[in-house]
Amino acid sequence: VGNGLQLRGLDGEKRVLMIGAHPDDEDTALLTALARGMGATTGYLSLTRGDGGQNHIGPELGEGLGVIRTGELLAARELDGGTQFFTRAFDYGFSKSADEAFEKWPREALLRDVVWILRTFRPHVIVSVFSGTPADGHGQHQAAGIMAREAFEAAADPQRFPEMAALGVEPWQVEKLYRRSWGDEGTHTLETGRFDPLLGRSHFQLAMESRSQHRSQDMGVAQPVGGRTTELLLWEVAPGIDPTDPGFFAGIDTTLIAGIEALDAASRRAVEDGVVRYRNGLSRAAEALSPSGPWESAEPLAEGLSSLREAEAVARRAAPDSELAQVLARRTEAVEHALLRAAGVTLKVVATDDLVVPGGEVEVEVQLWNGGDSRVGNAVPRLSLPDGWTAEEIAIEEGAGGGGFFGRGVAGSQLGEDGSLAPGALARWRYHVRIPADAQVSGLYFRDEARDGEMYQWPADDPGVW
């Protein structure tokens, strides 16, 4: 199932961002149909973490509830296949109007947060959950709709937030802006209740499992069978897009070589050739995929990956900062992950303690299992540690691990002398990790600093925390 779902997203490049105000505002059915069904890269931007909501599962309110609801959103995205984003806005409670919301949230600062996400995620399409009018009810809902429309224009304007360019974040033109119709006559209908043979249920049913993750809001729902649709209104389009074309992605170049005109003629030919060979490998991998032998797809996928790497290298040399080079780099990483899954390679990292303190020590074991039928080469792990942390590899006695903390039935490392791992073999490495006395205590980045009014404070220009 996982292999098949991954393969769906490896041909072409479609990116969609949904924008709402709170956790549980998102249309999980649409997110699921796009991500799991169409292989699109999807994201949900919630302006807030739902800190002002109710709590049916515990006493936490305010920032504490925001922590819980953040986790619920992340759990929902694990199911529907999306990526989760936030702005710095704190959910202070109910507002009657957008004007009241913008009295609490500095409008320009909030818009900057949304534009930052548009320019870094770079969606082709935005779907706004709300209209930005009093029909949305809650003032924060109205504010979310207004922000979606304003950010659609601002993200493409180099005069808006020009300081982002110094951080490598360039303007981005979103091609289409839709909004949920909510009873209005929609211009586009997307099927969200289609049965998916890979999932064994419909996208809508999976979406309802995703929605049920919002436990603190008592959002548990059934998973009914039958057809379902989402109605959308086309709100705005970029120059050159025909608004009368009925397709959701109509008029948008969603191929892997979109933007290839940024390259010289020789580089274009090389990239086009590499992508054609990659797609052929991808097609053969899909044909070879079998539930009883998923590794049958590994060889054609590996051949396709080799061609993709060649195309990426050409694009990097010819136009290192181009959208094409970035797309090919991301796709190469995604195919590498898909290849490991198809080959039956499993990596497991286990520590002797889930909580450590500054000045403390912990043992970590890395286990690499080749569950497929092909030999794995260059099977050498590298621990990624925070600054100041150190790791020393320690010997594993032959036969150790047959009991005790690191599990039963595990023999000594079966790694070959040439660093390869035979089919069915397990390699193990154990490390003694030391934490420096001045190590920074871990915490939630959005609570590292005190709020400024109704806005969280965190490094606004660090995309790693968004």
Predicted regions: what is each one?
Residues 1-17, 97-101, 107-347:
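Metal-dependent de-N-acetylase/amidase catalytic core
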Residues 1-120, 142, 146-153, 157:
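Active-site rim/loop-helix segments in enzyme catalytic domains that contact anionic ligands
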Residues 349-353, 393-394:
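Surface-exposed, proline-enriched loop/turn segments that connect beta strands in immunoglobulin-like
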Residues 354-360:
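Short, solvent-exposed loop/linker segments at the N-terminal edge
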Residues 361-369:
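Beta-strand-rich structural segments
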Residues 369-411, 416, 436:
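Proline-anchored loop/turn motifs at beta-strand termini and strand-loop-strand connectors
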Residues 417, 425-433:
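Short strand-edge motifs at loop-to-beta-strand transitions and within beta-strands
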Residues 435-466:
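Short glycine/proline/serine/threonine-rich loop/turn segments at secondary-structure transition edges
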